[in-house]
Amino acid sequence: MSPLSLPVATLGTPRIGPRRELKLALESYWAGKISEQQLHEDAFGLRAANWARQKSLGVTIIPSNDFSLYDQVLDTSVMVGAIPEIYAANGESVSLQTYFAMARGSQCGEQDASCAQSPRGSGVPAQEMTKWFDTNYHYMVPEFYRGQAFRLCSRKPVEEYEEARALGFQTRPVLIGPVTFLKLGKSTDSAFQPLSLLDDLIPVYIDLLHELAKRGASWVQFDEPCLVLDLDEAARNSLLHAYNRFAKEGPAIKIMLASYFGALGDNLDTALSLPISGLHVDLVRAPELLDQIVADGRSDLVMSLGVIDGRNVWRSNLPSLRQRLKPSIAKLGRHRVQLAPSCSLLHVPVDVELETGLASDVKSWLAFSVQKMRELAILARVLAGDQNVGLALAESECAATARRTSPKIHNANVAVRMRAIDQTMRQRATPFARRSEIQRERFGLPAFPTTTIGSFPQTTAVRNARAAHARGAMSEEQYDRFLKEEIARAVRWQEDIGLDVLVHGEFERNDMVQYFSEQLAGFAFTRNGWVQSYGSRCVRPPILFGDVVRPKPITVEWWRYAQSLTSKPMKAMLTGPVTILNWSFVRDDIPRSEVCRQLALAMRDEVRDLENAGAAMIQIDEAALREGLPLRRSDWKAYLDWAGDCFRICSSGVTDQTQIHTHMCYSEFNDIIGAIAAMDADVISIETSRSKMELLDAFRRYEYPNQIGPGVYDIHSPRVPETDEMKELIVLARTRLQDSQLWVNPDCGLKTRKWEEVRPALANMVAAARELRAASDPQIR
C-alpha cells in the first residue's frame, strides 16, 4: 500500500463472473456435460480472476471464501456438519452430490446417495430458501434440532485461503459468524431456540481459526449482520459469549466483525464491547454511525467505513464523501481506518464497461463492482493527502451534477398525476364479501380451483427466438407468429390436463420486471448487468433513473389473443409496483415511496385497459413485497402503509366483477398479515410447499377472509412431486382454512423449469385437486 493511501477492503465480490461463467459451469455440470473436476477448475478460475482484479484496482484487503458454488449459508451448514439426515451425509465429508441435493432437491438415481434416507422413492426435496435480509439474494435455511452435534466437515475456507496464497494474494477469509448463522436457521420444534446450540458450534469455528492461523492468516472477517436487527438480551449475550470464547480459546488472529444493511442502533454498545480488532459499519444505510463511532469507539479498534453503496449502482460523489469523511478520519487516526463498500459487492453487477448499449449520459452516472472498487481506491488516496487525483475528483463531481440536472429525470405530467391521487383511488368500491359473491356467480369454478402462477418454461427455442429477434435475424412478424404458436400450444395443453383457470405462459417476457420496465419511460437496461439471485439463477435488474410513464398498453394484445383460444378464464398477468421497485436499482434522489406511487399509477392504467378489453381475472404479482420490509420493526409500519397504498392504487380502478389476484413468494406472513389483508386482493397465492403449509398459520389466526392459493409444488427443485404428496399438502391447508377459500397452484412461476418436469407435476396437481373434490362434501364442489 502506498503511504499516500488508506487501506481499501472489500467484504466480498460478485461470484458469477463478468459474463455469468459460474452459471454456465453449474448448469453444464447439472446436465452431465462437464465433470466434477471441470466444475472445480472453472470455479478456481473465477476465484483467481476475482483476486487479481481486486488487486489491480487498488484493493489492499482482499477477501477469500466469499466465493460459493451455490450459497454461502449453505457452505456454512456443510462446513459445520449441519446436514439433515435425509441427505445421508456421513458426518466426515460432504460430497458435491449431497451439497446440491440440499440446494436443489434430488430425483433418485443409481448414484444418488441422498435417496438412502428419503421417505419417498422419488427423491428428496431441497432445503427451504428465503431472502438474505432485505436483499434479492436467497440463502438456504439451515435446519437445527435439540442435541445437534457439529463437526468440521469442510475445510473450504482454509483451502481457498491457501489457493490465494499460492497465487501470491494475502487474503482475509470471510466467515458467517456463529450467532448470525444460528439466527438464520429454523427448527421444526417451535419451542426450540437454535441459539442454545452456540456452545456446541463454537469449537468448530475455533478449530477453523487455528487452521487458518497456522497457514498464515493474520485477519479473519466474521459477518454478523444480525447486529442490525432487533436483538434481545439473549442474542446480545450470545455475541459476547461467542467472541469472548474466540479470544480466550482461539489463536492470535485478528477479527474484523462486519455488520451491514443498516444501523447498529441499540446493538452498538454490544458491538463495541466485543473482544475484536476491527468493526465494519454500513455508513450508506446508517450515516449517523460515523459520529457515534468517532465519539464512542475504542481507541484500539480498527474501523472499516462502508462508504460506497454496495447495493445500488449509482456513482459516488467523491468530493462530497471526502468533505464528510476527512474530519472523522482525522479524529480516528489513519492507522485505525479502512475504506470499504457498505456490504459485499455480491449485490451489484461486475463491470459497467461491458455495457455498450446504454446512453452515454446514463452510463456516466453508474458504478458497478469494478467501478466501486476504483472509487474506493481514489477516495483512499485523496483522504491520505495524495494530490494526483484531482482529475478523478472533478470527473466524479461533474457526473453527479449532470445527473442531478438532467432533463431525463423529471416529467411535469407525472407530478400533476401524483398530486391528483385521492382516497377513491386507494380502495375497491365494495367490500370483499360482496365482491366474492358476484365473482362466484360469474366464474362458476369448482372447489379447489386449479391454476398456475403465470409463466411456463422458457425453452431453448423460446430463448433463441428472442435472441434472433433482438439481433434482427427474426422479423417482428415472424417473432409474433412464433410467440402465438407457443401460447396456443400452452393453452391447448392446459385445457387437456384440466386446469380451471389458464395463463398464456409469458413467452414474450424475458423477466417479470424487465419486460414491464422496458416499456416504461424512466428506466435503463443493461446487457451484462447480472447479479446472483441464488445458485445459477441470475437476474438483470432494470435501472430506474427518472420519473415513470407508461406510453402505451403493454399486455393487452397478448391477453386478448390468449383468451380468444379458450372459453375458460384467462388470467392477465402483471408485475406490481412494489415488486418492480424492489427488483430494480432505484434512483436515490427522491424517496422510494414516491417512486413506487409513480409505478402504481402506470400499472393502474394497464389494469384498467385490460379490464376494458374483457379481462375478468387480473393477477398483479407482488413477489417482492416482504423483502422491502425494513430490518427494524419500528420502521415497518411506514413501509407497509405506502406499499399497500401503492398496490391499491394499482388494483382499485376495476369493477366488482373483476377478480384481482396477487402472488407473493419467499414470504413469512405472521408479522405482516394485517398489511396483507389491507391490500384487499380477491385471491392471493403464496409459496408454502417447502414450509409444509406453516405459513398458513398466520392466515388462520388472523381469520383472513379472502381466497388463498397455497403452493403445493416446489418449483425451485427439478423433482416431480407425486399426486399423494400434493394431496397431503392440500389436506394440511384444509386444516387451516375453509375449503371455499382454497385454490391449488404451484409455489411460483414455472419459467426456470423444463417441460418434462412441468407436465407431470401439473398433471399430478390437477389429479390431487380432483380427488379431493370427489371425496369432499358435495356442497363445496
UniProtKB/Swiss-Prot annotation:
Residues bound to L-methionine: I453, G454, S455, E506, D621
EC number, as in UniProt: 2.1.1.14
GO biological process: methionine biosynthetic process; methylation
CDD domains according to UniProt: CIMS_C_terminal_like, CIMS_N_terminal_like
Primary role: Catalyzes the transfer of a methyl group from 5-methyltetrahydrofolate to homocysteine resulting in methionine formation.
Native organism: Bradyrhizobium diazoefficiens (strain JCM 10833 / BCRC 13528 / IAM 13628 / NBRC 14792 / USDA 110)
Single annotated GO MF: zinc ion binding
Name of the molecule in the record: 5-methyltetrahydropteroyltriglutamate--homocysteine methyltransferase
Residues the entry annotates as binding L-homocysteine: I453, G454, S455, E506, D621
PANTHER family membership: 5-METHYLTETRAHYDROPTEROYLTRIGLUTAMATE--HOMOCYSTEINE METHYLTRANSFERASE (PTHR30519)
Intrachain disulfide bonds: none
Reaction it catalyzes: 5-methyltetrahydropteroyltri-L-glutamate + L-homocysteine = tetrahydropteroyltri-L-glutamate + L-methionine
Cofactor note: Binds 1 zinc ion per subunit.
Zinc listed as a keyword: yes
Top-level division of the source organism's lineage: Bacteria
Active site: H716 (proton donor)
Cofactor or coenzyme needed: Zn(2+)
Record-listed 5-methyltetrahydropteroyltri-L-glutamate binding positions: R20, E21, L22, K23, K131, R537, C538, W583, E627
Keywords, in A-Z order: Amino-acid biosynthesis, Metal-binding, Methionine biosynthesis, Methyltransferase, Repeat, Transferase, Zinc
Pathway connected to this protein: Amino-acid biosynthesis; L-methionine biosynthesis via de novo pathway; L-methionine from L-homocysteine (MetE route): step 1/1
Residues given in the record as Zn(2+) binding sites: H663, C665, E687, C748
Family according to the record: Belongs to the vitamin-B12 independent methionine synthase family.
Enzyme kind, highest EC tier: transferase
